[in-house]
Design a protein with these regions (language model features):
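Short, surface-exposed, low-complexity cationic segments
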Residues: 24-41
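Charged interaction scaffolds used for protein-protein
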Residues: 1-12, 37-54, 65-104
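Generic recognition of short, well-ordered alpha-helical interface segments
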Residues: 22-25, 51-55
Length: 104
């Protein structure tokens, strides 16, 4: 079940609905993989539209792993994501946004 307050985002991969979320560990993994020095730099990279399709794959793969699905960016690159690249980019943006939302 998707819990937006926990930062969950639903994504359909190869016909199966998956839940992704960005935990602190997933964010640290992304900083390392994308060679960004901080969380702020990571977010600014995406907010400033300076990201690549590889960045989206790395973000989604980290989020899916944190949500309980073991997948690499390389495997995800070969998978069918429902909605294609647009849906993948939207899911990546939602993951980042929800990771920093404070529940009220």
């Amino acid at each position: 079940m998707v819990n937006r307050w926990r930062g969950d985002v639903a994504l359909v991969v190869n016909g199966q609905r998956r839940v992704a979320r960005l935990t602190l560990g997933a964010l640290a993994e992304l900083e390392d993989a994308l060679e960004e020095p901080s969380l702020v730099a990571l977010v600014e990279r995406f907010e400033g539209h300076r990201f690549s399709s590889r960045d989206v794959l790395l973000l989604l793969a980290a989020g899916l792993r944190a949500g309980g699905t073991e997948v690499s960016a390389e495997t995800l690159a070969q998978a069918e994501i429902e909605g294609g690249p647009v849906a993948a980019s939207q899911a990546a943006a939602a993951l980042l946004a929800r990771a920093f939302v404070v529940p009220v």
